[in-house]
Amino acid sequence: MARYTGPSWKISRRLGISLSGTGKELEKRPYAPGPHGPGQRKKLSEYGLQLQEKQKLRHMYGVNERQFRTLFDKAAKLPGKQGENFMILLETRLDNLVYRLGLARTRRQARQLVNHGHILVDGSRVDIPSFSVKPGQTIALREKSQNLAVVKESVEVNSFVPEYLTFDAEKLEGTFTRLPERSELAPEISEQLIVEFYSR
């Protein structure tokens, strides 16, 4: 399944979550898109709830189904709970950590920065958004990319960097200091529903 490239607000409203990180797309119309307006949401079956939760998380991180399932299967081989491992693996993606550092305002924008070769990991250019960053590695902008308007705007408005990251706004450089705890990730997601979906 290809990655969705249409308007993110449609997905946000359909799934009831903000993909932009601002919540603005849900403020005026907190209901699914379509001609019927803010009618009552259809009650979902157990399968429907599981599918919806999977789609929420997949669209939140902006990955296609193949990448999503590959990471899910990888999480099963790690010690501990598969669902929690899965959430942590998604969080270690390079495009996500560029977003978390505040170098981009959305994950989609962060993915473009990586794709276009603006990002360095430990001093080497990495242009693969799914690259898995390890604790202790540094993430920085190439010197030639440090004057990008989108980066400057993002850094100016960003007021929060997770505790598992450190960030130097002057150098535009951050370090992934440790793996995150589950409690630090997406409280609105019930990963157990996703485990149940793939276990059917």
Swiss-Prot record:
GO biological process: ribosomal small subunit biogenesis; translation
Quaternary assembly: Part of the 30S ribosomal subunit. Contacts protein S5. The interaction surface between S4 and S5 is involved in control of translational fidelity.
GO cellular component: small ribosomal subunit
Pfam family, one: S4
Keyword annotations: Ribonucleoprotein, Ribosomal protein, RNA-binding, rRNA-binding
Name the UniProt record assigns to this protein: Small ribosomal subunit protein uS4
Chain spans, region Disordered: 22-42
Native source organism of the sequence: Bacillus pumilus (strain SAFR-032)
Job of this protein: One of the primary rRNA binding proteins, it binds directly to 16S rRNA where it nucleates assembly of the body of the 30S subunit.
Lineage: Bacteria, Bacillati, Bacillota, Bacilli, Bacillales
Gene3D superfamilies the UniProt entry points to: Ribosomal Protein S4 Delta 41, Chain A, domain 1, RNA-binding S4 domain
GO molecular function per UniProt: rRNA binding; structural constituent of ribosome
rRNA-binding keyword on record: yes
Domain S4 RNA-binding: 92-155
HAMAP family reported in the protein's UniProt record: Ribosomal_uS4_B
Family per similarity comment: Belongs to the universal ribosomal protein uS4 family.
Coiled coil: none
